[in-house]
A protein has these predicted regions:
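N-terminal alpha/beta PP-like core and its mobile active-site loop of ThDP/TPP-dependent enzymes
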Residues: 2-371, 410, 414, 500-503, ...
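Phosphate/pyrophosphate-binding active-site segments
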Residues: 2-4, 11-12, 166-169, 207, ...
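Conserved structured core elements
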Residues: 18, 22, 225, 252, ...
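Thiamine diphosphate
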Residues: 132-146, 292, 341-342, 350, ...
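Short amphipathic alpha-helical interaction patches enriched in hydrophobic/aromatic residues
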Residues: 159-162, 392-395, 556
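Glycine-rich beta-strand-to-loop/alpha-helix junction loops that act as flexible
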Residues: 245-247, 311, 428, 479-482
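Active-site diphosphate/adenylate-binding microenvironment
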Residues: 43-55, 59, 381-461, 466-467
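Short helix-loop-beta connector
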Residues: 90, 418-419, 471-472
Length: 639
């Protein structure tokens, strides 16, 4: 990250006296993108005694150029900030501040989510007094073995960069380091600057030049020629290659470069969850989602191909089918992060996706995949699109509750411009699997599914962040009852901010996805669906989700079937505020089309016969890794 200062030379030698908190806020407010926009779109804040006097005063002073947003839950507002950055393809971001104690530790889950997904967020939790004079203060964690420990140390494991500021002068080095990590393609992730209460209030004479408006330049590492030549040599020997596109293609602004590469060289493209949308859903070479939650077209090609070109993907188990899907193929990995580029013994190209694809295409020249391979990909892609149309447009039988595929179809039928106009937001349960298979995305950014950490509760908070980033788009949050009950308070925040969301809530009365996985592993239905849980004399309540949403200020309704859902979606699209639609769905009928084996360890010994049978199947699958691998649909799966 380079920062170009734009202040007059006469200001270079002057100083300005500010508190540490004022310095943080003023520095962040001065940063700009190359397009002249503020790098930081704002700060989410929940104030407490650990940050209200210091950061609260500083944020108020700069409330116009660096807006402050109040939320209802610290983890949720961090999710919103992360989603904001993802919606901006990591080119803009937000900061988050909390008090000490529970406010700070509520950030840990969100920080882990940002870390796993390689997404930037700046966390500014308050911390205990450096002076220790009033110890132990309210909410202070005391460690009898280490007097320097605070609850914020829990954030070290889930931060790309962590610093505790014990003197105001340390900000002169800590803040540039923080911005470097947040804007670096290889290191990108959460940054934590812990700000002790007394240090926030301390004044220091800072160089005025430190706060001059400056443009942040995002570092895009160029590929080494020898790495490009090794990758090109491997591809030239291939006849049946497949591209696997990850989030790095979108974050590297390489979607058009990817499309040009694929068509010039006749290589089909399979999508990960993070990479979906890099190629339009109806592009002839888009063979759909890959892996455990992928479609049959991509998985057939991955299992048959002789080379996989992985671009900007972490190659997690849902992409690789627990390392069984394309184990027969040679692997080329383009990734700005060397940790990811070296996975699976790949021929690594550590570089920005756009620059690497351009260089690789130039090195390949007129080389193309075998014509019959490209033709096969076209046919499989067309067949898969027909399958998607059939699955999403075939209504449930009489007396059947709808399933996820039915809901997805109704949502997209409610507006013919949905593939290019809507942004769908989701995170956990059965829905990400069906969305990867079935949602039609026409442009980059239209598919926002958090599937690195698969964090229940991200959905509504994430939707809020997306809407703040893309207010001109219709943001549709599709969420299950389980995730909604875990975290829903930012629906009220969306109403307060005028950041309209459409929330489609599928109520299958419990954790339906894990219930199916439990039974697939031989377990009895237990503690997942509400009916299978321990209950008191009054039984489980019947939850009126529409009424709950209304209590938070949203408009809402409950619908009885798919036709009513499609009509309700049109009312929601026309509404002037957040709108929730709830619908009862079947917990037992997932989309069977597509899919691949996923390794979930089954108990080696059990008194339950079904577990013994499941263990035998699991061992067969493990043994198969040395030869044939499990085929589509052999093992029901979900996150």
């Amino acid at each position: 990250m380079n920062q170009r200062a734009t202040q007059p030379e006469t200001e270079l030698s002057s100083t300005v006296r500010l508190t540490a908190a004022q310095a943080v806020v003023r520095y962040l407010a001065a940063l700009r993108t190359e397009h002249g926009e503020p790098l930081f779109g704002g700060v989410f804040a929940i104030f407490g005694h650990g940050n209200v006097a210091g950061l609260g005063e500083a944020l108020y002073r700069h409330r116009d150029e660096l807006p402050t947003y109040r939320a209802h839950n610290e983890q949720a507002m961090a999710h919103s900030a992360i989603a904001y950055a993802k919606a901006h393809m990591r080119r803009r971001m937000m900061a988050v501040t909390t008090s000490i104690g529970p406010g700070a530790t509520n950030l840990v889950t969100a920080a882990a989510l940002a870390h796993v997904n390689r997404l930037p967020v700046l966390l500014l939790p308050g911390d205990i007094f450096v002076s220790r004079a009033p110890d132990p203060v309210l909410q202070q964690l005391e460690d009898s073995h280490n007097g320097g420990v605070s609850a914020n140390d829990a954030l070290k494991a889930v931060s790309r960069y962590f610093d505790r500021i014990v003197h105001p002068a340390q900000l002169l080095s800590a803040l540039p380091r923080a911005i470097r990590v947040l804007t670096d393609a290889a290191q990108c992730g959460p940054v934590t600057l812990a700000l002790p209460q007394d240090v926030q209030a301390m004044a220091f004479d800072y160089p005025a030049s430190f706060f001059a408006p400056r443009v942040v330049e995002f570092h895009a590492p160029a590929p080494l020629p020898r790495e490009i030549e090794r990758a090109a040599a491997l591809l030239r020997d291939a006849r049946e290659p497949l591209i696997v596109t990850g989030g790095g293609v979108l974050y590297g602004q390489a979607a058009e470069t990817l499309r040009a590469f694929a068509h010039r060289h006749g290589v089909p493209v399979a999508e990960t969850q993070a990479g979906k949308g890099a190629l339009a859903w109806d592009d002839a070479l888009n063979v759909g989602g890959i892996g455990v939650t992928g479609g049959s077209a991509a998985n057939e090609l991955a299992h048959a191909g002789d080379c996989v070109l992985a671009v900007g993907t972490r190659l997690q188990d849902f992409t690789t089918g627990s390392n069984t899907l394309f184990k027969q193929a040679r692997l080329v990995a383009i990734n700005a992060n060397p940790f990811d580029a070296l996975k699976q013994d790949a021929v690594a190209v550590q570089a920005d996706a756009r620059l690497a694809l351009e260089a690789l295409s130039a090195a390949l020249g007129d080389w193309r995949a075998a014509p019959q391979w490209t033709t096969r990909a076209h046919r499989l892609a067309e067949d898969w699109r027909a399958t998607v149309a059939h699955v999403t447009n075939t209504p449930p039988d009489a007396g059947q509750l709808p399933r996820e595929a039915d809901v997805i179809g109704a949502v997209q039928r409610s507006d013919e411009a949905s593939p290019t106009g809507d942004i769908v937001v989701c995170a956990a349960g059965t829905l990400p699997a069906d969305l990867q298979k079935l949602w039609r995305t026409g442009a980059p950014g239209g598919y926002h599914v958090e599937y690195g950490y698969s964090c229940m509760g991200y959905e509504i908070a994430g939707g809020l962040g997306v809407k703040l980033a893309r207010p001109e788009r219709e943001v549709i949050v599709i969420v299950g009852d389980g995730s909604y009950l875990m975290m829903n308070s930012e629906l009220a925040t969306s109403v307060m901010l005028g950041a309209k969301l459409i929330v489609v809530l599928l109520d299958n009365r419990g954790f339906g996805c894990i219930n199916r996985l439990q039974q697939a592993c031989g377990g009895a239905p237990f503690n997942n669906l509400i009916d299978d849980c321990r209950q008191g004399a009054l039984g489980a309540p019947t939850i009126d989700f529409a009424m709950h949403a209304r209590s938070l200020g949203a408009l809402s309704e409950h619908v009885a079937n798919i036709d009513e859902l499609q009509a309700a979606m049109q009312r929601a699209r026309a509404a002037d505020r957040s709108y929730l639609i709830s619908i009862d769905t079947d917990p037992a009928r997932p989309t069977e089309e597509g899919g691949w084996w996923w390794e979930v360890a089954v108990p080696e010994v059990s008194e339950r016969a079904a577990v013994v049978v499941a263990r035998e199947a699991y061992e067969r699958a493990l043994n198969a890794r040395a030869g044939d691998v499990p085929k589509n649909g052999e093992d029901p799966t979900c996150p």
